[in-house]
Design a protein with these regions (language model features):
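Flexible "cap/lid" loop of the alpha/beta hydrolase fold
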Residues: 141, 150-181
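Catalytic active-site module of serine/aspartate enzymes centered on a nucleophile-bearing elbow/loop
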Residues: 282-316
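Short glycine-enriched nucleophile-adjacent loop
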Residues: 133-144, 150
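Conserved HGGG/HGGXW glycine-rich cap/lid loop of the alpha/beta-hydrolase fold
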Residues: 45, 50-95
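Alpha/beta-hydrolase fold catalytic core
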Residues: 3-57, 82-83, 284-287, 314-316
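Conserved alpha/beta-hydrolase catalytic His-Asp/Glu region
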Residues: 181-244
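Active-site loop/oxyanion-hole signature of alpha/beta-hydrolase fold enzymes
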Residues: 32, 42-44, 50, 90-127, ...
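Short beta-strand/loop motif that positions the catalytic acidic residue
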Residues: 246, 252-254
């Protein structure tokens, strides 16, 4: 397991299941900052989402691997003043349905696009973080006519991996590995997402919710099966070679202290900024900003800067 500490975007996924469960709990018990709604889609998929604010544009927030919709609350609190803001739990994640799905990037992108159609959303802007950024790019490539623009925050899918590297990464994150990660490693996995190298006090609820997951029995078993599928999906469906086909206005935001992009083990010659500038060079109509005092969770670490960049971009 010598590779585990340096896995790109995989560290958040692994959770322990070492405690004996004595009470019936559910991820539906999680406290969300806004009222949760649900929309039924095809193939028995049900998506939990929040819908706040009004405006001429609809901002659709897509979380990353192992995350959930509350990760966007610092952004929605500000942006809902001028825009309609919709954030969801992707299928398989806390309050959404948990079926026997593929959980690859195509699956998630199709869910996003169907949701746009089902809710009759107009002037839609996808805002994706990490894996959510890769999903947003996939959706933009599949149905650009449904979208107005893209905002990608520390997105996955830009850094490329060889088949051998991908095989190693996938082999390390199995259902059993997800279950058996020690509690102290969970905390380290959260800490590495933030610029200070420690989870800030106002983000500890994410860590606590993750620990709570262990006692949700069948829901957690599903989560442990799903995470490896998500990882395989990111690695098996790269978008880099198709980035030049994204024509819509795109905002790229990367935290200057992103410790997950690039992968330090496989790509020690790269920097976060070099990955970011590569993305900008490939997406024709894009602009890039490096966010100071921000790690992989840039939208949380420096929400003021991120919100400012989003507002300026949307007003153009």
């Amino acid at each position: 397991m010598k590779y585990l500490p340096i896995l790109l975007l995989l560290l958040m996924a692994c959770q322990p299941i070492t405690e004996t469960k004595t009470t019936k709990k559910s991820m539906l018990d999680f406290k969300y900052p806004y009222k949760t709604k649900f929309v039924d889609l095809s193939n028995d998929v049900k998506v939990a989402y929040i819908d706040e604010g009004k405006g001429d544009k609809t901002l659709i927030f897509i979380h990353g691997l192992g995350s959930y919709l509350p990760a966007w609350q610092k952004n929605i609190a500000v942006l809902k003043a001028d825009y309609r803001c919709i954030a969801m739990d992707l299928p398989g994640y806390p309050k959404s349905s948990k079926g026997d799905d593929t959980y690859n990037m195509t699956f998630f992108a199709e869910v996003i696009l169907e949701m746009i159609d089902e809710l009759k959303l107009k002037n839609s802007v996808l805002i994706g973080h990490s894996m959510g950024g890769q999903i947003a790019m996939m959706a933009a490539l599949k149905s650009p006519e449904l979208l107005q623009s893209l905002i990608l925050i520390d997105p996955a899918g830009i850094e490329r991996f060889t088949p051998q590297e991908a095989t190693i990464l996938k082999s390390l994150v199995t259902q059993e590995a997800v279950k058996n990660t020690p509690t102290e490693q969970i905390k380290k996995n959260f800490d590495i997402n933030f610029a200070a190298g420690v989870t800030p006090e106002d983000a500890l609820f994410m860590y606590n919710d993750r620990l709570y997951m262990r006692d949700t029995e069948l829901e957690y078993e599903h989560y442990c099966r799903m995470i490896p599928k998500c990882i395989a999906g990111m690695l098996d469906e790269p978008v880099f070679d198709n980035l030049k086909n994204i024509k819509m206005p795109t905002l790229l935001l990367f935290g200057e202290q992103d410790y997950l992009i690039p992968n330090k083990y496989f790509h020690a010659d790269l920097t976060t900024e070099s990955v970011a500038t590569t993305a900008q060079s490939q997406i024709i109509n894009s602009q890039l900003f490096m966010v100071p005092n921000a790690g992989h969770f840039a939208m949380w670490d420096n929400s003021t800067a991120v919100n400012g960049h989003i507002q300026a971009f949307l007003k153009k």
